[in-house]
């Protein structure tokens, strides 16, 4: 705990811009930021101002930059995200070319098909057949691999299947989207589309029109509401939204807020798979401790299953 607090003090000293978030978190009202930062002598040392993930809101918004480069691959699924039924149809076809040629029985036409292709690539379900060249092979050159065959055998209705996909999505080479979700959406706090956009501001500073941030929020909305990533796996254990269908069948969903929670029925095989992915990302270092896995403040290429699924010490 001391090391975490010590790190928090350094981070706050470097990145604080008096945004007022720490003052709002202080239950005793001991932090005053009206003119600089002043801590009252009545401070209870409850550390709630240090428990903000990861210690400072501004630091959290810029920590994913590398060499001052803005993160890329954050808008992989456009405004669509995916829907459970898209994957169901893909599984029914077992990922064959017939799925792509039929636009997934009409479920994924046009740009939706591009978004879904990015999803199956990021989820590790396909490998590229590089012998197939030309525009006509844009989709069908991506063939289901052995991992996909395992997922087909589990089926779309299996909660663990979606958990396996989430493990792959957070490590996707070409996409930062799920990795950003997992690292930046806080647990047990009310999040809104506006709060997500604020968190995205400094890693998408070139998004002057705001379209990219809107797309990401719309995609997140779809993941939360239209797939098991939301309530079942905990990315949105509580979701408040309104859904309307117009006379011509057009669906409109308004996300009011959501609260990230934990996966209530974790599968030990999935957790082992997540640990394998974690070790692989950490250079095959396998001598990690439970304390290390629970400490999400450590900067690392590996993402602990505790952070992916919100698992506590007892569950681990």
Question: Model-predicted segments: where are they?
Answer:
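Iron-sulfur cluster-binding cysteine motifs and their immediate structural context
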Residues: 21-38, 44, 48-65
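A short, conserved structural fragment
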Residues: 31, 57-58, 121-134, 225-251, ...
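Short acidic, hydrophobic short linear motifs in intrinsically disordered regions
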Residues: 90-106, 176-217, 283-306
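Extended, charged low-complexity segments
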Residues: 55, 262-316
């Amino acid at each position: 705990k001391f090391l975490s607090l010590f790190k928090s003090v350094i981070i706050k000293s470097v990145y604080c811009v008096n945004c007022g978030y720490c003052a709002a978190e202080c239950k005793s009202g001991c932090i005053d930021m009206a003119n600089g930062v002043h801590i009252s002598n009545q401070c209870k040392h409850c550390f709630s101002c240090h428990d903000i993930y990861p210690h400072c809101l501004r630091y959290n918004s810029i920590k994913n930059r590398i060499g001052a480069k803005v993160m890329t691959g954050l808008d992989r699924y456009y405004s669509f995200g995916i829907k459970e039924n898209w994957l169901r149809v893909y599984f029914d076809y077992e990922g064959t070319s017939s799925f792509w040629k039929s636009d997934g029985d009409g479920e994924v036409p046009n740009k939706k098909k591009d978004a879904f292709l990015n999803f199956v690539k990021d989820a590790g379900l396909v490998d590229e057949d590089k012998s197939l060249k030309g525009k006509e092979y844009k989709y069908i050159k991506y063939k289901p691999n052995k991992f996909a065959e395992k997922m087909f055998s589990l089926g779309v209705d299996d909660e663990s299947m979606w958990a396996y996909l989430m493990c792959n999505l957070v490590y996707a080479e070409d996409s930062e989207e799920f990795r950003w979700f997992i690292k930046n959406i806080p647990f047990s706090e009310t999040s809104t589309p506006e709060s997500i956009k604020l968190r995205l501001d400094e890693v998408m500073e070139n998004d002057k029109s705001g379209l990219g941030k809107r797309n990401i929020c719309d995609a997140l909305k779809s993941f939360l509401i239209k797939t098991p990533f939301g309530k079942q796996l905990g990315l949105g254990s509580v979701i408040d939204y309104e859904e309307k269908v117009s006379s011509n069948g057009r669906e409109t969903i308004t996300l009011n807020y959501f609260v990230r929670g934990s996966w209530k029925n974790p599968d030990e095989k999935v957790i082992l798979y997540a640990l394998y992915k974690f070790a692989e990302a950490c250079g095959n270092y396998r001598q990690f401790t439970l304390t290390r896995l629970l400490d999400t403040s450590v900067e690392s290429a590996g993402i602990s299953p505790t952070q992916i699924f919100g698992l506590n010490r007892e569950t681990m």
